[in-house]
Amino acid sequence: MQFGRICSFLDPGFEKGVPLGKVTVFAGESGAGKSYFAAGNIVKSAQDQGIFVVLIDTENALDEAWLQALKVDTSPEKLLKLSMSMIDDVAKTISTFMIDYKAMADEERPKVLFVIDSLGMMLTPTDVDQFNKGDMKGDMGRKPKALISL
């Protein structure tokens, strides 16, 4: 099943929508409209098809009024909005959710869509530790490894 018809000029592969059961990433410059696109099109379309949405906001940018203006149903029956910034927290949350989800009988399992806005803003424990110590040199390999394991 696919949802959220996307303009084919973005990518011909999305002409039929975003496929369920797959990881889809939207990349672009800051301010390009990725959050608007994900919330206004993908989340709304998923909800219209009865899909429960878990929206993980790492930027604290997706407030309820903005989502409602995009016609996203923010009621707890349709949307679980979480604010977190650590990659480890996101991974643990998804893992815990999936354990509980798999424990349900097949006929009771709702379709679920996870949206993470934004991968680029997530932090590793080392990022926080270095920031607290005033060490801003960074380590380019740490974050990609953590994201791959996510």
Set out the residue ranges of the language-model regions:
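The Walker A/P-loop phosphate-binding site
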Residues: M1-E77, D89-I99
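Post-transit mature-domain signature of plant chloroplast proteins, especially small thylakoid membrane
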Residues: L80-A91, P125
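Conserved phosphate-coordination/catalytic loops
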Residues: G4, M84, D88, K145
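Residue-level recognition of the N-termini of beta-strands and the immediately preceding loop/turn
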Residues: K22, L79, P110-V112
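Conserved P-loop NTPase mechanochemical-coupling segment
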Residues: T74-S85, M136
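P-loop NTPase motor core
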Residues: T93-L150
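Short, ordered loop/turn segments at secondary-structure junctions
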Residues: T58-N60, M84-S85, S118-L119
